[in-house]
């Protein structure tokens, strides 16, 4: 490929990169998106579709999620019904007194942050979700929780981006970034260079590799999640569901080692997606019999009706994990024109809308409506507050 230029280059065509490309075109930027494989071939194509707010830490993380959720209603109109966005509401299921004590505090803090959420006793939880067993002693409920088709969302963002002037190259991996005097100059592909003043690292679980091309150490590591997919059945659950243990394990490694939470959603087609393991196994995305058995054994006592539903397949995906559970967003010190947009782990779908908007705003104006300081790469440096 001969040398060419682009207003900006987005590395990665998952849901984050696709959203960024779409939002850039709305601001007059015509980006080039480069993807080693196919769109949504990484985390975005191997995950559930939860736009779940109750799993977010009160404070900045939840505020970011609320901002993103607010944009999905309009995105449904703009991107079309193919994204399968459904505001089903969600429930976080409590099984122990220890979980209940933690959830009570969580609800107070989430309400203070702006989330519409309430605590239900076990009886009310079963009234709203009749298939829940007596094992569920309480639950929280939020009407803000929703679900979407991750593939549909990613491809809809890319279609809209192309319509706005973006180019998308698939099967064309970036292999390096050229920096001159501390400033991004070009992205190197296998068959040529693309001159550009801006490179956006939306490479998901492989974002650390991209960072090394410009001399950065980015603390993003892959964490595998395995998910079961059932046959299509008539409506079995009414909401998207997660366990309180899942929420706690997301932020507390000790709880994660003591057991596994779960998440359940039913798609438009009637299939149920049941997850998920959280495993540090490098870049191995294969499913394991042990992992799948663990998921099935974990969910069956909570929703006994699932014992009668056949599993038709399973998949594993790699989530881009950061040590503090927050994504890395925005510019980085020392490399002008290099912008981070990775590290969302299991929140990429939920945060995709606002991430794309914020990164596009920063690229075009150097400002954002939502402060990015808490999400900067420099927070991991020694001595950072």
Annotate each PLM feature.
Residues 25-45:
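Glycine-rich FAD pyrophosphate-binding loop
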Residues 150, 284-385:
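C-terminal catalytic lobe of FAD-dependent flavoproteins
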Residues 63, 93-102, 141-159, 169, ...:
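Short beta-strand to alpha-helix junction loop
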Residues 22-26, 49-52, 81-86, 176, ...:
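Active-site substrate-recognition segment that forms the wall
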Residues 48-128, 261, 290, 298-299:
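Dinucleotide-binding Rossmann-like beta1-alpha1 core, especially the glycine-rich loop
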Residues 2-16, 32:
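Beta1/beta-strand and adjacent pyrophosphate-binding region of the FAD-binding site
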Residues 140-197:
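Helical element adjacent to the flavin cofactor pocket in flavoenzyme catalytic cores
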């Amino acid at each position: 490929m001969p040398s060419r230029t682009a207003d900006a280059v987005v590395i990665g065509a998952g849901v984050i990169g696709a959203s960024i490309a779409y939002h850039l075109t709305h601001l007059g930027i015509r980006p080039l998106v480069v993807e080693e494989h196919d769109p949504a071939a990484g985390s975005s194509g191997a995950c559930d579709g939860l736009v779940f707010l109750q799993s977010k830490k009160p404070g900045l993380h939840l505020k970011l999620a609320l901002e993103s959720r607010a944009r999905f209603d309009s995105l449904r109109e703009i991107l079309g019904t193919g994204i399968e966005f459904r505001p089903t509401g969600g429930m976080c299921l409590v099984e122990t007194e220890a979980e209940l004590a933690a959830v009570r505090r969580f609800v107070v803090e989430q309400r203070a942050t702006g989330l519409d959420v309430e605590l239900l006793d076990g009886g009310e939880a079963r009234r709203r979700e009749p298939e829940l067993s007596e094992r569920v002693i309480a639950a929280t409920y939020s009407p803000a929780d929703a679900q979407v088709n991750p593939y549909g969302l990613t491809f809809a963002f890319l279609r809209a981006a192309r319509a706005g002037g973006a180019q998308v190259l698939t099967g064309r991996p970036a292999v390096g970034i050229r920096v001159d005097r501390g400033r991004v100059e070009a992205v190197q592909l296998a068959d040529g260079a693309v001159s550009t003043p801006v490179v956006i690292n939306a490479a998901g679980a492989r974002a650390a590799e991209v960072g090394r091309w410009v001399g950065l150490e980015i603390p993003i590591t892959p964490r595998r999640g395995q998910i079961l997919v059932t046959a299509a059945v008539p409506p079995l659950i009414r909401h998207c569901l997660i366990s309180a243990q899942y929420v706690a394990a997301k932020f507390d490694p000790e709880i994660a080692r003591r057991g596994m939470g779960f998440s359940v959603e039913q798609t438009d087609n009637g299939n149920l997606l049941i997850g998920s393991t959280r495993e540090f196994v490098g870049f191995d995305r294969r499913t394991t019999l042990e992992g799948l058995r663990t998921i099935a054994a974990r969910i069956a006592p909570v929703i006994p009706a699932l014992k009668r539903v056949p599993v038709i397949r399973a998949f594993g995906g790699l989530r881009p994990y950061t040590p503090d559970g927050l994504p890395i967003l925005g510019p980085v010190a020392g490399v002008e024109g290099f912008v981070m947009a990775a590290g969302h782990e299991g929140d990429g779908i939920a945060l995709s809308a606002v991430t794309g908007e914020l990164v596009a705003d920063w690229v075009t104006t150097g400002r954002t409506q939502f402060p990015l300081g808490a999400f900067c790469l420099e927070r991991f440096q020694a001595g950072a507050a």
